[in-house]
């Protein structure tokens, strides 16, 4: 045990990258939507935890809505208008980058 404490081994540094200030292009958003939900704005994951075209959790949706679009707090992401889902995804991207979509975020800059 003492040997491990005295010699902890290599460490990993994770570096976050800033989102592209110009933002993703339309075709990149389309690729993300297709990857997340085949572009279906009413999509619901098999567990029911992720909803809408961008597969928002209700908690993340309400957090972003509370910051920018109070009228959308409490709205089911899968029932929200497409333009509202698009705005919410763009707002989330500006705050957190593509990492909010762990698999499909690879389509965004």
Located regions from the model:
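Membrane-proximal envelope biogenesis segments
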Residues: 1-19
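Peptidoglycan cell-wall recognition and remodeling modules
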Residues: 15-109
């Amino acid at each position: 045990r003492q040997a491990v404490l005295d010699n902890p081994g290599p460490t990993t540094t994770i570096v976050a990258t800033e989102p592209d200030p110009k933002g993703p292009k339309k075709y990149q958003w389309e690729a993300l939507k297709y990857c997340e939900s085949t572009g279906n704005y009413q999509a619901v994951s098999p567990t029911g935890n992720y909803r809408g075209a961008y597969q928002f959790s209700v908690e993340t949706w309400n957090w972003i809505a509370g910051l920018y679009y109070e009228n959308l707090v409490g709205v089911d992401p899968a029932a929200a208008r497409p333009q509202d889902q698009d705005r919410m995804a763009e707002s989330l991207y500006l705050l957190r980058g593509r990492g909010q979509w762990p698999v499909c975020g690879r389509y965004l800059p």
